[in-house]
Amino acid sequence: MKNPFAHLAEPLDAAQPGKRFFNLNKLEDSRYGRLPFSIRVLLEAAVRNCDEFLVKKNDIENILNWNVMQHKNIEVPFKPARVILQDFTGVPAVVDFAAMRDAVKKLGGNPEKINPVCPADLVIDHSIQVDFNRRADSLQKNQDLEFERNKERFEFLKWGSQAFCNMRIIPPGSGIIHQVNLEYLARVVFDQDGCYYPDSLVGTDSHTTMIDGLGVLGWGVGGIEAEAVMLGQPISMVLPQVIGYKLMGKPHPLVTSTDIVLTITKHLRQVGVVGKFVEFFGPGVAQLSIADRATIANMCPEYGATAAFFPVDEVSIAYLLQTGREEDKVKHIQKYLQAVGMFRDFNDTSQDPDFTQVVELDLKTVVPCCSGPKRPQDKVAVSEMKKDFESCLGAKQGFKGFQVAPDRHNDRKTFLYSNSEFTLAHGSVVIAAITSCTNTSNPSVMLGAGLLAKKAVEAGLSVKPYIKTSLSPGSGVVTYYLRESGVMPYLSQLGFDVVGYGCMTCIGNSGPLPEPVVEAITQGDLVAVGVLSGNRNFEGRVHPNTRANYLASPPLVIAYAIAGTVRIDFEKEPLGVNAQGRQVFLKDIWPTRDEIQAVERQHVIPGMFKEVYQKIETVNKSWNALAAPSEKLYAWNPKSTYIKSPPFFESLTLDLQPPKSIVDAYVLLNLGDSVTTDHISPAGNIARNSPAARYLTNRGLTPREFNSYGSRRGNDAIMARGTFANIRLLNKFLNKQAPQTVHLPSGETLDVFDAAERYQQAGLPLIVLAGKEYGSGSSRDWAAKGPFLLGIKAVLAESYERIHRSNLVGMGVIPLEYLPGETADSLGLTGRERYTINIPEDLKPRMTVQIKLDTGKTFQAVMRFDTDVELTYFHNGGILNYMIRKMAQ
């Protein structure tokens, strides 16, 4: 059907009549000018894609009427301009696409219909690990090992880039997905098929929101949802409320963008922004560079919002030119955004739109800080760090507690390393990593770290040799300007050599610690510390042996590495003593903002970005040499332990089955609050005594060849065994941290997978009980696929993180939510009952259903299918089944 809004299309430039745009001002609707800028992007996409089938005129009216409809839980469709994927989530997506082609063929359809219609970029950044550090050849050795471990995955991805249209792969060694997106992939405005429209995207990584800092609306979705978008489906979303976050004032000269984002993260967690957009405005925004804004937008998942949007302004335009974008294109970007009312002047209050609620932060109140020891929202001022850590030591086990007996607070353990004796204590730093796109995309904090390293070396300071130090930049541009500015040798001297271009320590690919260090930590039962410039510090994520992990700016990472402990008050205690016996304090070596800006102006230049990115797809010789099959259907290798055809579609037919009630289900796990997707489906190392390790050992692999769970996401047998395999999982059935549960019929304590397998063999359905914020953290589709394969039919929780809830829906697992004010405790649930959940045939969004226990007790819960589209997916047994049936008909 013809687009009913076709009359809004007009040329942007009289000289190019063939290039048009949808002029939303021609709607002649006064409501448009009051909409938040982020909502204007949703409106434009709806107007441009209106076909009265997937996108209806009524959807446009609902978005225009945002001021009223934001409170009505109304569903709207959104068709993003593109999709980005990283390899940990990209491999299972390509595996699903390959399996969907097989399924469509089996059902009599054309398998080549399974093809991305929406452009997709897949950046390989999650596979490299810090195996080598503190040596000049660390980068080469880590990259060689990455290829050795992942050759099969990389060959499969190369097959995918040839077998599917519209899919571009950025090879390993290029950088981190979100930084490459910011510096290179982002268009800001698309110029395609004779039409200008705003760049927008979804990504299979929760930190996709980083691009919001450049004025490109984007957020993380589950891999399952991203696959549907790639196949042309719109995302069905609840029209979000938009929190206006007003920034005022100017930051103190000693404050970094990291300090600002950690302050905002704590603030917005307290405000409560889950499921909402945050849009930044106010004169303080004009004080922030695009790198600063991107740092703030990057940590959006940590404060729980869907998106953290900074509209495009003059600073954004200057950034596009600085990063080597073509001048003519940048002119058209500005002209288009001005024509359509999406270009901002943050000092002009008349441009401030309506918001659901306004919260404010005066940037001059921000102080240097870290976050930890177990959550990104737990901000600690650097001046309070020593006191805070010491109070955490004795506090009850929890987010801010390790329950170490008072008489053990000063325990020490000596050990030999490289023929010298060293001592570890509670609070000793054993990992110090400058890592993550959150910070390595920001030249001011990276050059700040480099200048601090220079001053530290010149002052005679050093880092103890057993501390695992590393520098993993998000793109080659970082190395370029660190080298050109002359600070790289000083970073290397302190142990911060470049170890790889990828996520590395930030996602738990921190590699092994020296054996003597691990022995000292375990024998002394010490709370050892990791300090990283990342965005997440959940328990067990950074490294199994660092029970405390703090997020900090790159200069502070170096400072704590030099100090060797977090039990230091930088204002009163020296970092160290130089060869002359003089005490050196942090204030003596901290670079000024003027020093940093002078170096940045001189060395961060457009030519550098052009040089790095013009050869990004061809620079990796190992990638270029990979052979990949050319067939359109993938030839699965039954012996492969990396790539396996998943069982999701084996019994799929064209006929729909009515939904069945869940009868007499057992509880597999009884969990508490803030269970992350890391707890549900860890990405890190495969423990040697785990079900996944036994599977690999039975296939002839040695522990050295296990690789990580993240790298094995193309193999469902390993991922099912890795579900709930996090050593920090706290299950109320056991009252201890372990990847285990009680098999209720027998009373035996088993690994979670072994217990689930026993239930499945007996034909017994399973559910999971949980508390608040279930599924927070990474947008990990295996955190939904894994439970599905374990036979889990439903999860009953107090609340869900947005992406994980939609992933459960996408796999046909029911997300149930207690009624307001009710919890497992208030209802007296022990988890040892059997649960019957009545599922009516005439399901409606957010319907209340009855749950009956074998004790005779009944209560109600809300079925969190939030939209009609989600119900359609559930009736089909999941979103991919729905797509296959659609393509096969």
Swiss-Prot record:
Binding site for [4Fe-4S] cluster: C437, C503, C506
EC class name: lyase
Major localization class: cytoplasm
CDD domains (UniProt xref): AcnA_IRP, AcnA_IRP_Swivel
Pfam families in UniProt: Aconitase (PF00330), Aconitase_C (PF00694)
Cellular component per GO, a single term: mitochondrion
Catalytic activity: citrate = D-threo-isocitrate
GO BP term, example: intestinal absorption
Cell compartment(s), UniProt: Cytoplasm, Cytosol
Any GO MF annotation of the entry: metal ion binding
EC number: 4.2.1.3
Entries under PANTHER family matching the protein: ACONITASE/IRON-RESPONSIVE ELEMENT FAMILY MEMBER
Subunit-level organization: Interacts (when associated with the 4Fe-4S) with FBXL5. Interacts with frataxin(81-210).
Summary of the function given for this chain in its UniProt record: Bifunctional iron sensor that switches between 2 activities depending on iron availability. Iron deprivation, promotes its mRNA binding activity through which it regulates the expression of genes involved in iron uptake, sequestration and utilization. Binds to iron-responsive elements (IRES) in the untranslated region of target mRNAs preventing for instance the translation of ferritin and aminolevulinic acid synthase and stabilizing the transferrin receptor mRNA. Conversely, when cellular iron levels are high, binds a 4Fe-4S cluster which precludes RNA binding activity and promotes the aconitase activity, the isomerization of citrate to isocitrate via cis-aconitate.
Protein's recorded name: Cytoplasmic aconitate hydratase
